[in-house]
Amino acid sequence: MRKVFLSLAVLASSVASAQLVNVGSIEKINLPSGVRTIESVMSPDGSFAVINAAGSLQKVDLATGKIVKIADDASSGMEISKDGNTLIYEQSVFKDKLRYTNLKSVNLNNGKESTLVNASRNLQGYALSKNSVGAVDNGKYTAKSLNSAAPSLVTVASIKAGALIVSVNGVSNNISPQGTTGQSYLWPSVSPDGKKVLYYLCGEGAFVCNLDGSNPVSVGMMRAPKWYNNKVVVGMQDEDNGDYVTGSKLVASSVDGKVMQDLTQISSMAMYPSVAANGSKVSFVTPAGELFILNIK
C-alpha cells in the first residue's frame, strides 16, 4: 500500500482569519484491490486507523501500510480504547426475522474477542473511558471493564425513540434540549472532559449543550459531528440529488458556534470524520469507499 499526498489547493480551504484546525496535508490511503470502506475510526495516537469494509474490520498501519484483518462480522459503529489496545464494535444478528445487536470487543494485540452486550433489541449507545465501556441497553445502564481492573462509570450520550438520553453515574435522563415532539436526535457524544454533549438535530444542525440539556448552542449545519477537542468539533456537510451524494466536505466549528472553518472542499466527497484523540489526524471516507487522512500541524 502506498500513500498519495494531494494538493491542499484542490482539497482544502480554511478561514484564514480564524483558523481552528491547521491542516498540513491530506493523504489518500491506497487500500487493496476490491476493498471499499464505509467508515473508519482513528487510533488515539494517530498511528493507525480501523476501517469497515463490508463488515470486515481491518487495521491500517499509517506508517508502514500494513493491513491486518480483525473481524468479519461487524455492522456499523466502532470505537478504540484510550490505550489503543481494544476495538469496540457492533454486530448485527438475525433470529426469527428479528434484528439483534451484539456489542463486542476485540484485543488488537492478540485478537481475543468478548461480548459486552448480548442480543440487544435496543442498544441505545455506548462510550469508552480509560479501561471501561458504558452501554445503555433499552434504558438499562451497564459498565464493563476491558481488563482485570474494576469498571468505572462512564458518562454516555445515547438515543431512545429519537430522544437524547444522557447517563451520568449510571443514572439515565432524557435531556432533549429542543424537546421531543416532532424532533429526532442523532450522533450524540460526550466531550473529552466529560462536561458537554454534542448532537445532531434532524433538519436543524449540530448543537452542543450541558450534560443536563441546558444552554444548547448551534455549531452549524454539520452531520456526523465529532469532538476534535473540548473547544472544537468537526463534521460533514454533504449534498445529494435525492439518489446519491453529489458533494461533501469536512468542516470545523468552535463550540460557541462563532467560528466555522472548511477543512476540505465540497468536491473532496469527504464523509464521516474520525478524530485521533491527540489531535494529530482526522480520517474520512468517500462514497467510492476510499480512505483519506488529514494530517494536522
What is each residue range found by the language model?
Residues 1-20:
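Bacterial Sec-dependent N-terminal signal peptides
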